[in-house]
């Protein structure tokens, strides 16, 4: 996993382009100290970053394959397709996205079908567990429950059907909001900006926030909004959620911290995530300076080749790629 992360950081340096020093926020992330070796999230991040690099280099089939492989480890790399779909719809260039989607489906099936055929019960255990389990300790639902005594949407035993539906609907509404924003914005949003919003909505609304999930947010946030103090503060607060939760679970008899203290840390973490998302929205709407665009003559370094960064990209005129590819011109009315 350590070697995989080193390679991931090297690819992030490629994607950071002319802001290569922002890569230090990824390499030295406080979240990495606590969660790097928890579960299989590092490989999924590796495949997601590799997919973004492949898409930047116009290798859309490869990008799709990598997204499918990443999704075989963890669900979140599939969220990248939402970002690329938004850009594809805005540009009316669906062919690159279609290749990515097809390759992602095929590669995911290539990994999962043999496992399913060998042991279908084991293959479906993840879905069963996530369907049947209730909310996790550090979600907004758990915080509301501890503060108000609320017992949840569902009553009795069995799968939390209403909770599952509510979390899914809230996430889908968030994705729809990202799509509308991406289509209506004055200039095509950058891929990292869209990914930040999609992943952010998933983290905030999902009924499970395993501590290592926060690692998913690190690289998109660094590439979308390289505000060092804000990101380092968020990562430091987020890093504290897990040890504070463990401390709380020790119980009052063993000097564990009270529930209100855990709630404060969780609310602070969520507030930072939401603040980052709000700033990204303001950036997309042109109400905040975009340091990444400024450093690349208006281009999105995740959608354009380094050779293209030398020439300014006019806000009111399309670029002229030599082949069909995602670019960053405004939407055509």
Q: Where do the protein language model's features map onto the residues?
A:
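Extracytoplasmic catalytic-loop and juxtamembrane helix elements of membrane-embedded
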Residues: 115-145
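Aromatic/glycine/proline-enriched transmembrane-helix motif characteristic
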Residues: 134, 140-204, 288-333
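Transmembrane helices and adjacent periplasmic/lumenal helix-loop junctions
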Residues: 40-42, 65-87, 110, 204-213
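Transmembrane-helix motifs of polytopic, lipid-linked glycan transferases
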Residues: 1-19, 24, 48, 173-181
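Aromatic-enriched
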Residues: 233-333
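Multi-pass, polyprenyl lipid-linked donor-dependent membrane glycosyltransferases
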Residues: 3, 24-28, 32-50, 73, ...
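Specific aromatic-rich, kink-prone transmembrane helix
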Residues: 44-60, 199
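Perimembrane helix-loop-helix junctions
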Residues: 79-106, 117
């Amino acid at each position: 996993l350590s070697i995989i992360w080193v390679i991931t950081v090297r690819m992030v340096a490629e994607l950071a382009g002319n802001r290569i020093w922002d890569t230090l926020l990824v390499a030295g992330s406080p979240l990495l100290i606590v969660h790097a070796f928890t579960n299989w999230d590092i490989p999924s991040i590796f495949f997601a970053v590799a997919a973004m690099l492949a898409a930047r280099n116009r290798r859309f089939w490869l990008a799709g394959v990598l997204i499918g492989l990443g999704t075989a480890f963890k669900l979140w790399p599939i969220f990248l397709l939402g970002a690329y779909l938004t850009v594809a719809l805005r540009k009316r260039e669906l062919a690159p996205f279609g290749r990515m989607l097809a390759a992602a489906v095929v590669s995911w099936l290539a990994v999962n079908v043999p496992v399913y055929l060998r042991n279908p019960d084991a293959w479906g255990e993840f879905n069963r567990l996530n369907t049947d389990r209730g909310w996790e300790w550090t979600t907004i639902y758990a915080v509301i429950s501890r503060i108000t005594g609320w017992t949840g949407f569902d009553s009795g035993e069995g799968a939390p059907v209403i909770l599952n539906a509510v979390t899914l609907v809230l996430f889908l509404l968030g994705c729809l909001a990202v799509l509308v924003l991406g289509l209506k914005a004055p200039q095509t949003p950058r891929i990292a900006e869209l990914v930040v919003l999609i992943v952010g909505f998933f983290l905030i609304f999902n009924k499970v926030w395993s501590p290592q999930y926060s690692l998913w947010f690190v690289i998109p946030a660094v590439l979308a909004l390289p505000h060092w103090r804000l990101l380092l503060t968020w990562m430091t607060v987020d890093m504290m959620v897990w040890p504070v939760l463990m401390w709380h679970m020790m119980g009052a008899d063993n000097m564990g911290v009270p529930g209100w203290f855990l709630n404060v840390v969780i609310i602070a973490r969520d507030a930072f995530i939401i603040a980052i998302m709000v700033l990204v929205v303001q950036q997309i709407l042109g109400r905040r300076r975009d340091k990444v665009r400024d450093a690349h003559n208006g281009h999105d370094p995740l959608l354009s080749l380094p050779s293209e960064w030398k020439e300014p990209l006019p806000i009111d005129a399309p670029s002229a790629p030599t082949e069909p590819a995602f670019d960053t011109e405004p939407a055509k009315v």
